[in-house]
Curated annotation (Swiss-Prot):
GO cellular component, one term: chromosome, telomeric region
Gene source species: Cryptococcus neoformans var. neoformans serotype D (strain JEC21 / ATCC MYA-565)
Broadest EC class assigned to this enzyme: transferase
Source organism superkingdom: Eukaryota
Record-given protein name: Histone acetyltransferase type B catalytic subunit
Biological process terms in GO annotation: DNA repair; subtelomeric heterochromatin formation
Region of interest: Interaction with histone H4 N-terminus: 52-54, 235-237
CDD domains named in the record: NAT_SF
Keywords: Acyltransferase, Chromatin regulator, Cytoplasm, DNA damage, DNA repair, Nucleus, Transferase
Amino acid sequence: MAETLEEWISDSNQVLNLQMVRTPEDASLLQYEEQQNIDVFNPAFTYPIFGDNEKIFGYKGLDIKLHFASGSLRQYLDISYDAKLASSTTPPDEIEGALYKFIPPDYTKSEVEFQKRVAGDAETFKPLGEKIGSYAHPSAGRKGKGQGDSGMAAGKAIEDNEDVVEYEMYKATWSTPGFREYHRRMQIFVLLFIEGGSYVHEDEDAWEFIVLYERRTRPDSGIFTYHFVGYVSVYPFWCYPDRVRLRLSQFVILPPYQHQGHGSKLYNMLFRHMLDRSEVAELTIEDPAEAFEDLRDRNDLRFLVKEGIVKDPMLYVDVGKGKRGSRVEWELAIRRKYKIAQRQFDRLLEMLLFRQLDKGNPDKVKAYRLHVKARLYRFNYEMLSQMTVEERKEALAKTYESVVEDYKRILGMTFG
């Protein structure tokens, strides 16, 4: 019987099919390499919706379509299957009821109605909030690199250039008209693509969001259409005596847009926006996933190199001699200037030191090793203080080797 019931179990990550839908006219403007923007994709996680095992019981040939109008994010739900188990003792799981708890109730189950919404919203939807930045990428299939932030200065030239696609970022809060309702449509991506992700509380007024869109121009009409790419949410916490600490809580780039540099653009916009705000003391990250931590490291490293940190003689002063004197003052001044959290700042300096390290000089290598171990000891003091001297030495040695290997990996990704 167990073997028979197994046939009625579906992997919820595989049967939940997501799609960002455009009008046929807008879809036809995409080049071959851009078709992934409208292809079906699957979630990374569904346990918040369908349980820890991420299984759905009671169906064969199950197909759950959750489609979104690519800009407005209005939703269409369709549940189909080849067979449904008829059993009173082990009834099939209630699929729509499970999803209903996590999406706004105004979704439609009519494909015709959904296509009408897509068509109407394509012409009327405009991003909510204040535009705070933009950048341009070549259309897929075109050779060359994106124009990066220089695209912001190009103005009308970008709008008239069919070879590039512009991406725009908008800042919004709960007080932005219409954004609360819009957020209820986009927050499902947090559950589906961030492990341990959860919805934010709407009664917490201070939440801030930056939403990233792809902007297209219809060639004949000149109408701009906007297509959701991802977003980041941050929350300000009081920081003594009269400033705030911004905590990055959620960061999502949809799979069709991943590995194209959009995550870095969104992160760097947040970083610059934070630097421009005098009331912000630093940016912290809440339980970052490894992929996001790598993205953060790469961009923070590039930023510090661009700012000339490796050319500053103070970076190399008193390495391996402990935290003291002028080096402490220099580190504090630089960290406060760039508003980077302490542990992250320490790691960044260690990576830059390792990159510049003369690895053929035993004295320099030893000084660097002592420098890193001293930081590791401070960071893990409670655990290490309970060990014997030999155990502590062994633990620090293993941790140091692991840290250095990770630094090599990150530096390789960042600088080649």
